[in-house]
UniProtKB/Swiss-Prot annotation:
Ca(2+) binds at T263, L266, E430, E433. The keyword DNA-binding does not apply. The active site is at E421. Disulfide bonds join C301-C318. One of its GO terms (molecular function) is carboxypeptidase activity. It is an enzyme of class 3 (hydrolase). N-glycosylated. It comes from the Eukaryota. It comes from Rattus norvegicus. This is Aminopeptidase NAALADL1. Aminopeptidase with broad substrate specificity. Has lower activity with substrates that have Asp or Glu in the P2' position, or Pro in the P3' position. Lacks activity with substrates that have both Pro in the P3' position and Asp or Glu in the P2' position. Lacks carboxypeptidase activity. Lacks dipeptidyl-peptidase IV type activity. The lineage of its organism: Eukaryota, Metazoa, Chordata, Craniata, Vertebrata.
């Protein structure tokens, strides 16, 4: 994920100087021709252009993009990954459909790879070292693609090398509570190997939690009950259905943070300070290896010990037990242990981001950024190439209009292809670190389309509250795939909805965690962000994600046969993302509704009052200032909306428009406090930092309150609750001040 430089424009220097606009540092060349014949300061969204773009977005072209992008494995920094860099550059420099400029930006980052000379292994060994069972080092070759030479062995990226051996225990999801449960059952975890399943806590957290309790090695598998609705037989899974085959193994980064591990808060350039590798935090402390559920079954169905709790049971066709060790009448002799051999190595590699830029005609120094990562663990047809295929089609259509001279956006559009996302959002994070000030000053919104199609039932949108209105407006005008005759909006509301006190029944939008490249934009820079995709009907499957996620079975044929035959859902995402992009880049007034934050804040406040209020009161901590701050924000947001409506009915001065748009753009930054969560790297957003408590309220307040409730917590813990309450109050007051008339101080 990465970005570049921007230069000036050549359309009326006086007007540009009057607005104080230069595009700056992102590689837009100086214009040698007029940008567009019809450009004016009052340029607004052209509905005819919008309709034209919607009509030109072609499902068959998206299909061909995906076929090309996913035909070979392209892990970050591989030869194929670099070939795709050149493909993107070629498309964005094309004489008929290219953009104003395209450029690469390179960072030297620390990645983790399995050894090619000594593959990782998992074995069941007897007391004398006899190997009774060896696990599959690679997934089974079911369609030919799994045996290609560049398919990486399944591994846990950033797990340390080592060859621990010990009796096996089953630790469910590998949470802290899970390990405490095992100890409460009288199981001595020191020197054991823990078998865990994906879900509940992050990959790396499983190993961190395990090591804290004396475990020396960790195995991780995907249970068919979590991904296949219980189906586990070969004839029930890929290539016969969308289900994960028994040998399928989910790869992934086990690094707990995001960005280059050696250069936190600094771009990974050769001259940047780097940590000593021994001082890196966030890596798994013990050897860890993912395995398929076929191999996990051999372990779980032979374990000794007491039965696991009902909530720990899965779908492998046997009763899960806790261990330690194997049952005496099972497949393995008494005293057999599990040996985990990990030979991963750390390497410094050069990873590229690619930026394609369309220079804005009126406000070139205001950026609407559309990003998708390029790298995958194997072929990556779904993750991420479904998103890259859509990105290339949107940029082709807009580039064609640009080259014909019939359109140029009001604001600059930046298309970004991020590198090394799978290792921890590295490309996008390095980019935001390098251009922090510029991006905070100039970026209107960040649109992320990582996986564009999980499946073909309905839209899934995540984002901060101000983007709700522009997504709703776009989806009401686009037909949903299929023959229902519904709009994407009306189809969406059938699958997932909520009751809004303002709007009534509306589609449900999710919030943004740190699962893709929007993370550094929203949490670190405070840039209004969203993520768009099509997904499955959750009433028909309990799968936590599409089943072949991060495996060698995520291929073009998998997409075409099981996820989106005809590619109409890909086209629907292209139209949705393209419409949102145009509305944000071309509308005179930014289509961001700050009042939609009022609902969120009121909900947070109500949760705090109902769940925290009584105990806070007993510690002489009042929520009164928070109530006042929420009301102040709501009033300021409503007043700004009314001011915008008034301006829209008149012929506003360009500077009036600019001032209002800056208020809309900068609102999200007002919620940043870099000192609020010192234990959370990159998390500065007071409303969207990780909430580890059970109460859906202001995360800092919720987390501090939960810690203060713990046994033996003292005055210091309650002082932190007061501090977090003050942080929330001041963030809301600062946000309200941002929305008030600019002359009010």
């Amino acid at each position: 994920m990465h970005w570049a430089k921007i230069l000036g424009v050549g359309i009326g220097a006086a007007a540009l100087l009057g607005l104080g606009i230069i595009l700056g540092h992102f590689a837009i060349p100086k214009a040698t021709e007029p940008l567009a014949s019809s450009v004016s300061d009052s340029q607004d969204l052209d509905l005819a252009i919008l309709d034209s773009v919607m009509g030109q977005l072609d499902a068959s072209r998206i299909r061909e993009n995906l076929r090309e992008l996913s035909k070979e494995p392209h892990v970050a920094t591989s030869a194929r990954d670099e070939a795709l860099v050149q493909l993107l550059l070629g498309r964005w420099k094309d004489s008929a459909s290219g953009l104003d400029t395209a450029k690469t930006y390179e960072y030297t980052v620390l990645l983790s790879f399995p050894s090619t000379e000594q593959p990782n292994s998992v074995e069941v060994v007897g007391p004398n070292g006899t190997v009774f069972h060896s696990f599959q080092p690679f997934e089974k070759n079911l369609t030919g693609e799994q045996a290609e030479p560049n398919v990486l062995q399944p591994y846990a990226a950033y797990a340390p090398p080592g060859t621990p051996k010990g009796p096996l225990v089953y630790a469910n999801r590998g949470s802290e509570d899970d390990f405490k449960k095992l100890e409460a059952e009288g199981i001595n975890l020191k020197g054991t190997i823990a078998l865990t399943r994906y879900g509940s806590v992050g990959r790396g957290a499983k190993a961190i939690n395990a090591a804290r309790h004396g475990v020396v090695g960790v195995l991780v598998y995907t249970d068919p009950g979590d991904i296949n609705d219980g189906k586990s037989l070969p004839n029930e899974t890929f290539p016969n259905s969308w289900g994960l085959p028994p040998s399928g193994v989910e790869r992934g980064s086990y690094y707990e943070y995001f960005g280059d591990p050696l250069t936190p808060y600094l771009p990974a350039h050769p001259v940047s300070f780097r940590l000593d590798p021994h001082n890196i935090s966030g890596f798994p402390p013990i050897p860890t290896q993912p395995i398929g559920f076929e191999d996990a079954k051999n372990l779980l169905c032979n374990l000794n010990g007491t039965s696991a709790p009902d909530s720990w049971q899965g779908a492998l066709g046997c009763e899960y037990k806790l261990g330690p060790g194997f049952e005496p009448n099972g497949n393995f002799p008494a005293g057999s242990e599990v040996k985990v051999s990990v030979y991963n190595r750390l390497e410094l590699r050069n990873s590229s981001n690619v930026l394609g830029i369309i220079q804005g005609a009126v406000e070139p120094d205001r950026y609407v950024i559309y990003g998708n990562h390029r790298d995958s663990w194997v072929h990556g047809a779904v993750d991420p190439s479904s998103g890259t295929a859509v990105l290339l089609e949107i940029s082709r259509v807009l580039g064609t209009l640009l080259k014909k001279g019939t359109w140029r956006p009001r604001r600059s559009i930046i298309f970004a292809s991020w590198g090394a996302e799978e290792f921890g959002l590295i490309g996008s994070t390095e980019f935001t670190e390098e251009f922090l000030s510029k991006l905070q000053e100039r970026t209107v919104t960040y649109i992320n389309v990582d996986i564009s199609v999980f499946s073909n039932a309905t839209l899934r949108a995540q984002g901060t509250p101000p983007v709700q209105s522009v997504i709703f407006s776009a989806t009401k005008e686009i037909s949903a795939p299929g023959s229902s005759g519904l709009s994407i909006y009306d189809n969406w509301i059938r699958y997932t909805n909520r009751s809004s006190p303002v709007y009534g029944l509306v589609p449900s939008m999710g919030t943004l965690g740190a699962g893709s490249d929007y993370a550094s934009f929203i949490h670190f820079l405070g840039i209004t962000s969203m993520d768009l995709a099509y997904t499955y009907d959750r009433s028909k499957t309990s799968a936590r994600i599409y089943p072949t996620y991060h495996t060698a079975f995520d291929t073009f044929d998998y997409v075409e046969k099981f996820l989106d035959p005809g590619f109409s859902s890909h086209q629907a995402v292209a139209r949705t993302a393209g419409s949102v992009l145009l509305r944000l880049s071309d509308s005179l007034f930014l289509p961001l509704n700050v009042s939609d934050y009022s609902e969120t804040l009121q909900s947070f406040l109500q949760a705090a009052q109902e769940n925290l209020g009584a105990l806070l009161e007993s510690h002489n901590i009042s929520l009164g200032p928070l109530v006042t701050a929420v009301e102040k924000f709501k009033a300021a947001a409503a007043a700004l909306n009314q001011h915008i409506l008034t301006l829209q009915k008149s012929s506003p001065d360009p500077l009036q428009v600019r001032m209002v748009n800056d208020q809309l753009m900068l609102l999200e930054r007002a919620f940043l406090n870099p000192r609020a969560f010192p234990e959370e790297r990159y998390y500065s957003h007071v409303l969207w930092a990780p909430n580890t408590a059970s109460v859906a309220t202001f995360p800092g307040l919720a987390n501090a309150y939960a810690r203060a409730q713990e046994i033996n917590s003292g005055a210091e813990a309650w002082a932190e609750v007061e501090r977090q309450l003050s942080i929330a109050v001041m963030a809301l007051e600062g946000a309200a001040a941002t929305l008030q008339p600019v002359t009010d101080l």
